[in-house]
Amino acid sequence: MKTQKYNYGTAILSAFEYLLKNYKETFIIGQGLWSPWYVGNTMTDLDKKFGKDRVIDTPVSESATTGAAIGASLVGMKPIVVHPRMDFMLYAMDAIVNQAAKWSHMFGGQAHPGVTIRSIINRGGEQGAQHSQALHAWFAHIPGLRVVMP
């Protein structure tokens, strides 16, 4: 078995490539996906390889982006939402906490919003206090959400 070393950015890019290549229902949606300033090297050329209909760069609207992804997941799509700043995920709290986290239980297991949300913390040294919080532990306390991180 061949082993390969990855840094975080390359590992994320490799995982996204694998998912987009092997699962046609997967798409990635979020702000700044086509800009390395927003997402570093984690999205390099994915829009060119898989098309802008599967790597969707959105306007600044965390709530709308997250809500659209959750809705798409209910009809069989496998969306990945990228929030380039975890702090601004707070604008999407209704969609995350009151919808995605609860629907499976609210509808007797008939609705399974299978959405993955990736959030980026402190994209560099220039971020201020309101751009660099780590809210993982806070999200981990919400029933129905699964929080994973390296």
Write out the residue ranges for each language-model feature.
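Thiamine diphosphate
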Residues: 1-150
